[in-house]
Amino acid sequence: RKESSAASDVYKRQPYDAFMLEDDGRIDEKIFNEYTSLSLRYPPRFTQVSTCEEALSQLSSMPYDLIICMPGTGDNEGFDVARTIKAQYEHIPMVILTPFSHGITKRIANEDLSSFDYIFCWLGNTDLLVSIIKLIEDKMNLEHDVSEVGVQIILLVEDGIRFYSSILPNLYKFVLKQSQEFSTEALNAHQRTLRMRGRPKIVLARTYNEAIGIYEKYKNNILGVITDVRFPRVERGEKDALAGIKLCAAIRKEDPFVPLIIQSSESENVSYAAKYDAAFIDKNSKKMDVDLRRIVSDNFGFGDFIFRNPDTLEEIARVKNLKELQNILFAVPAESFLYHISRNHVSRWLYSRAMFPIGEFLKPITWNSLQDVDAHRKIIFEAIVKYRKMKNQGVVAVFKRDRFDRYSNFARIGDGSLGGKGRGLAFIDNMVKHHPEFDEFENARVAIPKTVVLCLSL
């Protein structure tokens, strides 16, 4: 599994561009602070060079995970130099980071960019660098995390360099903040880290064929799709004025419930959003970033789970975690419960919070397959109980009064040693978890008593 524990090479073509990116030389400090604020581990280190020779010298002296090249505003050779470096180090992802200007935009339109992984437009925000690193990591880890763990995907379809350079930092910051919040449900620090790693991956597609290919490959793990309307069908092809609408139509044929968000600068496209049951974001809006966060939160299962009246959409009840959902299941009015289960809202909420086993179990149990509200409540309740028992067994949890109940197993108060007796019970609990044959004894259950240990350091 790839994380940015090694360095990234920032290759800068001109001193002014370096100054513009660094803002008086504090780029490492800014990235470190950004990682710390988002509870991310292993902030990358940057090596800065200003010539092709320096870049090649650095690359030959130590391993690097990423090359970021900045062609200058008046630099006609920057792309050629970047290709020279990429030709020698094909295995290292390369990103082109350009200042925003009409001259650069025009030059990019005439360049063959197929050698590079991504092109970004520098808009003066260090969040973009975090997004670039996370986008590369997500791409590297995608196959493993989806197939082995069940991680979900947010598919962003956008070919406008300036737009996705603005959208991605906003989207990543939102998703990472959400993963921070839901990780607090974890029983201890180790499980918190695992929950944060289970956050949805963001995948960027820039053509119709690329987008539909990603969807077809990972359709069972798509948390939601955010798409532009006008973009090419193939790389370096002519723009199709309705490519995004055709993508929504193709996805809706496969899945009537996956959340779709259409974003466009052409307001008449709002009618297509209604046709395909998609949310709409106006790219011309001054509060586009705010709209995106709100709509993603409402549609992709982030935040609290809100039970609503299906007729008025008025809030009936709100739950913040799995225990609260378990406690309220049988009190939710039948019509509200039916509204949510018939649209896969419960499984999507669980998926977005990295609760993959229970989400995977509940997703295929649709209203069409069961058509019994009370039976559905019971299935969800029993699945939550089983999941909570599984997560609690063999784990030394941090004691929290509002979470400790009949399904809790072993918790500690304080940070010091568990002591001999406490450690012995924790060991036995762990052994029971790893030996399922203990469940085979008829009329006998092998388990430790419910335990709370006062540690030596309170």
Specify the residue positions occupied by each region the protein language model found.
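Single conserved hydrophobic/aromatic residue that forms the stacking wall/gate
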Residues: 2-7, 11
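Short mixed-charge
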Residues: 27-39, 176-199, 437-442
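Amphipathic alpha1 helix at the N-terminus of the CheY-like receiver
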Residues: 18-37, 57, 162-173
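Conserved phosphotransfer microenvironments
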Residues: 20-28, 32, 42-43, 48-56, ...
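Output/docking surface of receiver
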Residues: 1, 48-50, 72, 95-163, ...
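Nucleotide/phosphate-binding sheet-loop regions of phosphoryl- and nucleotidyl-transfer enzymes
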Residues: 361-458
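Terminal, compositionally biased segments used for targeting/anchoring and flexible tails
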Residues: 268-392
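Acidic di-acidic motifs
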Residues: 12-18, 24-27, 51, 158-160, ...
